[in-house]
Amino acid sequence: MAETRLASLDDSMASRLPVHSQTLFDAKTAKKLTFEAIASKLGRSEVAVAGMFYGQVQASGEDVEALSELLGVPKESLSKMTNFPDRGRSGPMPPVEPLIYRLYEVVQNYGYSFKAVMNEKFGDGIMSAICFQTNVEKEVDEQGATWAVITLRGKWLPFTRF
């Protein structure tokens, strides 16, 4: 059986994140839990749960209760997770972490193509990143190559005439 490898918080990022981020990652590592396992207990997507750990997604009171119980962390130390997140400050721009840079590169290389196709399909507007869902899946093709499948689902918001 393959060993489960866990995502952890890099020390160089900790100062840019909320205090509860370190607490959550330490408890996650100690309990040997994946984001998938935590998400299953919370009834949330694993990307949303990871976003909570990085301070980019607001947690509900129920999320805090469940995290406290699952991770063995006092609720009081997680109480600020229900505050409004200060998004977009967790890393430098452009990104320097290779995987995150590849995602940035996808937008650099295909952003205008996405825009053109979306404008043709939906009209003049934008895809919301607020009324939004995302998912990450793993696929293995017929040749045995592993592929990452990232789904981005955002509500279409047409620009209004004023």
Curated annotation (Swiss-Prot):
It catalyses: cyanate + hydrogencarbonate + 3 H(+) = NH4(+) + 2 CO2. GO terms for molecular function: cyanate hydratase activity; DNA binding. Its EC number is 4.2.1.104. The keyword Transmembrane does not apply. Catalyzes the reaction of cyanate with bicarbonate to produce ammonia and carbon dioxide. CDD domains: Cyanase_C (cd00559), HTH_XRE (cd00093). The keyword Lyase applies. Disulfide bonds: none annotated. Signal peptide: none annotated. GO terms for biological process: cyanate metabolic process. Keywords: Lyase. This is Cyanate hydratase. HAMAP family: Cyanate_hydrat (MF_00535). Coiled coil: none annotated. Belongs to the cyanase family. The active site is at R102, E105, S128. SUPFAM superfamilies: Cyanase C-terminal domain, lambda repressor-like DNA-binding domains. It comes from Pyricularia oryzae (strain 70-15 / ATCC MYA-4617 / FGSC 8958).
